């Protein structure tokens, strides 16, 4: 049986993660979660950095597989450039490249990655606030400062 402290922590984490996901949906809506919709990547949303991230992903996706991993061969030809330098989240890019090739057409993961970031920030923010505030409502209210 779980003790009260671990049950409270789990509850705070999941409620904070839901709060983070809700904030994501309020800020960006559902459009970024459509992997076939890259309009928000090309047009930039709030900030313009995502255009660089998406361009790096597009170059990497079109590159042939080889060693070292995560090299976009179309940039800095003929040597290529690591997608880490384009901030295209190399681990996610490497894992999703085979999926993107199977799906074909437009494929972006930036929206889902951002949703996961919001949820994790909300969850861990609630846990951090829970260290200093009693109950469940007060840490979740403080969690709004994190997401």
Predicted regions mapped to residue ranges:
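Start-transfer (signal-anchor) and selected internal transmembrane alpha helices
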Residues: 1-36
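Short linear motifs in intrinsically disordered/low-complexity regions
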Residues: 4-5, 80, 88, 144
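Membrane-water interface of alpha-helical transmembrane segments
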Residues: 7-10, 14, 107, 111-114, ...
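Hydrophobic alpha-helical transmembrane segments
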Residues: 14-18, 112, 140-144
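Membrane-interface coil-to-helix junctions
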Residues: 24-121
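Membrane-embedded helix bundles of polyisoprenyl
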Residues: 115-147
């Amino acid at each position: 049986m779980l003790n009260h402290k671990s049950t409270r922590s789990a509850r705070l984490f999941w409620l904070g993660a839901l709060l983070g996901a809700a904030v994501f949906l309020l800020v960006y809506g559902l459009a970024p979660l459509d992997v076939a919709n890259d309009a928000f990547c090309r047009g930039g949303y709030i900030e313009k950095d995502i255009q660089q991230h998406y361009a790096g992903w597009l170059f990497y996706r079109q590159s042939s597989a080889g060693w070292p991993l995560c090299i976009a061969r179309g940039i800095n030809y003929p040597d290529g450039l690591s997608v880490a330098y384009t901030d295209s989240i190399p681990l996610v890019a490497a894992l999703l490249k085979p999926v993107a090739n199977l799906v074909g057409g437009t494929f972006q993961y930036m929206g889902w990655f951002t949703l996961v970031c919001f949820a994790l920030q909300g969850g861990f923010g609630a846990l951090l606030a829970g260290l200093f505030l009693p109950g469940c409502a007060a840490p979740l209210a403080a969690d709004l400062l994190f997401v």
